[in-house]
């Protein structure tokens, strides 16, 4: 059968490395390493899963060339000493046996390091933090610069000894080489600062030293921020200029974008379209006639194919997409595109947990980042009936997982459609990518002959009893939180009123005009939902006021979303009222108490109550009572246990495997 995506599966040779297809797993931190910087066996398995899934080239996440000074994480990989070679050798062996090539990214964090982790003041080109509010680094002396150059070369040689097929030098994303390249962070007046040629000198010396150490046949990749997307930073045109000073020994450019201060363009926000950066790779490729990797929210294989066919890039880089589905390449190659579990770019598990919380990565759509779909190999050892109440993402995950291991499974959903809150929120234009997850889950459910779905059906005790359950999963979701505030319950979500929850707003979404200049919007609640409402109306030109009881709007958001929403609030002039509490609701104004204890009125054309969600358990207590004298276990998962994020519900849905094991079905 002829493959629909011939360009994706065309091999390519770079020096002596031949890659079997054009899909590259781009480097992305995991926090899976050991605290001493060694590669853990969990870590090795993580990369092997992606190699088994068909990925052509895996570029391992950034490894420190000079620890502790150059480290940017408590579990970051190290390649600065020979004692790290054995585990890295094992990694290369594990990836190679599946036909994939493997490279490793070499890096020095510079000012992106933290003194609390490295035990010393971070260093950089100048005494400029790598992001607003960051630590002030110490400018490097010339002899220190040359020492670091040598460390890059030594690290590259180790990579070669380990069995890596190539190395990538990280020259973007606010790490040390980027700090020299960027006029934002490089204020030097010596031969390493000022002109583009001088700012590129450090990168040039590093690349030349790496080439000297690895010889003429070993591929060198360089990752760049082609456009820093910050005021005063390098534009694409600036980058095209400075690349001339070190492109000679570079075999492949990995063309990214953004700095720490524009992280929403570095780790793409979810509203950015598939392949939005590909024009940057095309510009680099056309000027320097070098193979280029393009990255940027690429989830759809047709987009990837079109980029390659159009000559915009030579490789398609995927980081989060392969966290979400290690089998992405195999599914595309063998015609199972509908089975792809697409990343929704929520940045919660991969960026939020890793960067914000310094924890190992997780994934909203993939509850088993390391083990993939291996659980399906084991089937229940005796008949088991599982009844799942609620067809949102948590309920769907539980139902599908139970059916996939052989349970006879019944899914009961009150509404006409499956997908729950994720499907609803995806109707907000900037959140449409979110629909990929419930759509995938619905498709997955449709393929399971032992999963029976009842829609437009309210679960009752009698109905559940009739299905003879061995295990019951309650996944009935959540509803908006509406506290007992004067006027609120009389007005919110009522016909003819101007006060609504986000659910009612979405129901009316097509009624709001595209041009809302001069109209006033007031939002009570500065969490994720309130910010979604803010984005919708500011983009239509409305004047928006946000009210939050806490000292900060966006508390608890992942760093990518937080940076993005802060930028949007500044761009659109959103009025932020923090430490402010709602006292009364009227049809054209909110009455609030400000931090000084004074009463204020906030007039609006439309007012929105976005105070989060609360668990909704309409039948749980009845089920508990009805099955109290039986061996039937009832588990409550997702938002119906406690309103949180999709990621927790997905994990709890997959945990049906633990429930089955507890009852000796597995």
What are these regions (language model features)?
Residues 366-379, 447, 453, 481-540, ...:
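Glycine-rich dinucleotide-binding loop and its adjacent helix/turn
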Residues 267-273, 376-378, 383-384, 424-436, ...:
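Short, contiguous acidic/charged loop-to-helix segments that flank catalytic cores in large enzymes
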Residues 1-389, 393, 397-404, 408-409, ...:
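Flavin-dependent oxidoreductase catalytic cores
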Residues 533, 557-558, 627, 637-666:
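A conserved FAD-binding loop/helix module that cradles the flavin
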Residues 37, 71, 305-306, 329-330, ...:
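Short amphipathic alpha-helical segments
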Residues 388-456, 481, 526-560, 564, ...:
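Beta1-alpha1 glycine-rich phosphate/pyrophosphate-binding loop at the start
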Residues 303, 459-463, 645:
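Short acidic active-site motifs
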Residues 435-481, 490, 495-519, 539-625:
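A Rossmann-like FAD-binding core segment of flavoenzymes
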């Amino acid at each position: 059968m002829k493959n629909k995506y011939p360009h994706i599966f065309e091999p390519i040779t770079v020096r002596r490395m031949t890659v079997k297809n054009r899909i590259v797993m781009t480097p992305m931190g995991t926090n899976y390493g050991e605290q001493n910087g060694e590669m853990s066996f969990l870590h090795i398995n993580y990369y092997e899963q992606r190699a088994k899934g068909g990925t052509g080239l895996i570029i391992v996440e950034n490894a420190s060339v000079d620890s502790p000074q150059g480290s940017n994480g408590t579990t970051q990989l190290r390649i600065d000493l020979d004692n790290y070679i054995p585990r890295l050798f094992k990694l290369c062996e594990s990836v190679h046996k599946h036909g994939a090539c493997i490279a490793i990214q070499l890096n020095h964090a510079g000012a992106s390091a933290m003194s609390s982790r490295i035990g010393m003041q971070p260093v950089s080109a100048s005494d400029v933090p790598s992001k607003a509010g960051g630590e002030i680094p110490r400018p490097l002396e010339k002899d220190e610069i040359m020492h670091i150059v040598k460390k890059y070369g030594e690290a590259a040689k180790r990579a070669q000894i380990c069995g890596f097929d190539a190395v990538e030098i990280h020259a973007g994303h606010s790490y040390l080489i980027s700090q020299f390249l960027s006029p934002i962070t490089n204020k030097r007046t010596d031969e390493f600062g000022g002109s583009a040629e001088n700012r590129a000198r450090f990168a040039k010396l590093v690349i030349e030293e790496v080439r000297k150490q690895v010889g003429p046949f070993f591929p060198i990749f360089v990752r760049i921020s082609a456009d820093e997307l910050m005021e005063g930073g390098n534009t694409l045109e600036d980058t095209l200029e400075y690349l001339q000073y070190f492109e000679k020994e570079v075999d492949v450019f990995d063309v990214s974008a953004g700095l720490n201060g524009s992280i929403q363009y570095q780790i793409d926000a979810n509203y950015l379209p598939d392949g939005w950066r590909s024009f940057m790779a095309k510009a680099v490729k056309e000027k320097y006639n070098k193979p280029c990797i393009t990255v940027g929210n690429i989830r759809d294989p047709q987009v990837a194919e079109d980029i390659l066919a159009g000559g915009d890039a030579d490789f398609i880089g995927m980081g989060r997409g392969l966290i979400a589905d290690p089998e992405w390449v195999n599914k595309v190659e063998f015609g199972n595109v509908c089975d792809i579990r697409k990343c929704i770019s929520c940045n919660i598990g991969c960026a939020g947990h890793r960067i914000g919380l310094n924890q190992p990565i997780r994934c909203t759509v993939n509850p088993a980042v390391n083990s993939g779909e291996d659980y399906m190999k084991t089937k229940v050892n005796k008949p088991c009936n599982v009844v799942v109440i609620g067809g949102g993402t948590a309920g769907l995950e539980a139902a599908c997982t139970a059916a996939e291991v052989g349970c006879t499974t019944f899914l009961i959903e009150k509404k006409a459609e499956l997908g729950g809150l994720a499907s609803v929120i995806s109707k907000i234009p900037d959140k449409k990518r979110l629909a990929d997850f419930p759509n995938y889950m619905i498709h997955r459910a449709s393929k399971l002959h032992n999963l029976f779905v009842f829609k437009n059906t309210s679960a009752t005790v009698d109905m559940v009893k009739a299905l003879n359950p061995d295990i019951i999963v309650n996944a009935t979701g959540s509803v908006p939180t509406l506290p007992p505030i004067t006027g609120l319950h009389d007005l919110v979500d009522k016909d003819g009123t101007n006060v609504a929850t986000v659910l009612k707003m979405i129901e009316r979404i097509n009624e709001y005009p595209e041009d809302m200049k001069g109209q006033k919007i007031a939002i009570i609640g500065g969490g994720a939902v309130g910010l979604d409402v803010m984005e919708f109306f500011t983009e239509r030109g409305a004047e928006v006021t946000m009210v939050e009881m806490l000292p900060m709007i966006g508390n608890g958001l992942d760093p990518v979303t937080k940076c993005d929403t802060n930028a949007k609030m500044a761009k659109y002039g959103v009025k932020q009222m923090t430490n402010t509490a709602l006292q009364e609701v009227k049809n054209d104004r909110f009455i609030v108490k400000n931090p000084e204890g004074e009463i204020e009125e906030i007039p609006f054309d439309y007012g929105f109550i976005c105070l989060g969600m609360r668990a909704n358990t309409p039948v749980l207590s009845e089920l508990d009572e009805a099955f109290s004298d039986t061996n039937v276990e009832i588990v409550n998962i997702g938002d119906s246990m406690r309103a949180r994020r999709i990621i927790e519900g997905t994990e709890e849905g997959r945990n049906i495997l633990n429930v089955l094991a507890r009852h000796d079905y597995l």
